[in-house]
From Swiss-Prot:
The keyword NAD applies. Substrate binds at R81, R87, N119, R153. Pfam families: Ldh_1_C, Ldh_1_N. This is Malate dehydrogenase. Belongs to the LDH/MDH superfamily. MDH type 1 family. Keywords: NAD, Oxidoreductase, Tricarboxylic acid cycle. GO terms for cellular component: cytoplasm. GO terms for biological process: malate metabolic process; tricarboxylic acid cycle.
Length: 312
């Protein structure tokens, strides 16, 4: 099993690479790529960790050597949010980066499962899909927007509020991966109930958690370590499913049946070919139903922006 991390010299990429080096199954290969010249050194640094995961780093304009034979590609390349920016301000820079890298994937490892971490995910996933489609290699069961950070944040905040172990809480989060498009389904957590005020406050905190980190870092960055952990959780789940493990379920942002929007984050059963089954989002509370209906215009606009970027 070979996993490639593109954008591996950045804050998310390094955290992700560290977690993959320590947690990928024995015998896996990990390849790191970034435009930054430090990348081969990041791989050498990680290679000293005693796990049976082979690692190699590549830098420069061409990601091809890192992508050859990859089963899973995780893309975290791009610029990070600064205070006062929202995820859409990132679009102008990151759209071109994602387009370029996905073109290289289409040529070098078109059958790989691809996880997009680079923000704004609502839009960058649409860009990736259109690029793969143009190349004639698009498989909607193998392209994912990694929204796992919304899930782990939800788990943490709910556990804090309710005095539970974070590992005992699993909150499904649907929709997209920015602002109002992030919808935690707090009504679906077994054995936990909330007041209306708690639901409103928690939902808002989960939606704005990225800004919480950006402000706390006082201009020094955005959520990199928690995002690295979230991306590792998703990547490792995908690897386990590809290797044949059963009942691996994660939420991610994928192309579905278009019931709500072309791309939508929902619980997915993962399998040997990527998405095995798009699971139902279940019964929503009145609050959740309203929030879902209220986000769709925003989500559809985000998606259209990505489609137009490739097809203009």
């Amino acid at each position: 099993m070979k996993v490639a991390v593109l954008g591996a010299a950045g804050g998310i990429g390094q955290a992700l690479a560290l977690l993959l080096k320590t947690q990928l199954p024995s015998g896996s290969e990990l390849s790191l790529y970034d435009i930054a010249p430090v990348t081969p050194g990041v791989a050498v640094d990680l290679s000293h960790i005693p796990t049976a995961v082979k690692i190699k780093g590549f830098s420069g304009e061409d990601a091809t050597p890192a992508l050859e034979g990859a089963d899973v590609v995780l893309i975290s390349a791009g610029v990070a949010r600064k205070p006062g920016m929202d995820r859409s301000d990132l679009f102008n820079v990151n759209a071109g980066i994602v387009k370029n890298l996905v073109q290289q994937i289409a040529t070098t490892c078109p059958k790989a499962c691809v996880g997009i971490i680079t923000n704004p995910v609502n839009t960058t996933v649409a860009i990736a899909a259109e690029v793969l489609k143009k190349a004639g290699v698009y498989d909607k069961n193998k392209l994912f927007g990694v929204t796992t950070l919304d899930i782990i944040r939800s788990n943490t905040f709910v556990a804090e509020l309710k005095g539970k172990l974070p590992t005992d809480v699993e909150v499904p989060v649907i929709g997209g991966h920015s602002g109002v498009t992030i919808l935690p389904l707090l009504s679906q957590i077994p054995g936990v109930s909330f007041t209306e005020q708690e639901v409103a406050d928690l939902t808002k905190r989960i939606q704005n958690a990225g800004t919480e980190v950006v402000e706390a870092k006082a201009g020094g960055g955005s959520a990199t370590l928690s995002m690295g952990q979230a991306a590792a959780r998703f990547g490792l789940s995908l690897v386990r499913a590809l290797q044949g493990e059963k009942d691996v379920v994660e939420c991610a942002y994928v192309e579905g049946d278009g019931q709500y929007a072309r791309f939508f984050s929902q619980p997915l059963l993962l399998g040997k070919n990527g998405v095995e089954e798009r699971k139902s989002i279940g019964k929503l509370s009145a609050f959740e139903q309203n929030a879902l209906e209220g986000m769709l215009d925003t989500l559809k606009k985000d998606i259209a922006l990505g489609e137009e970027f490739v097809n203009k």
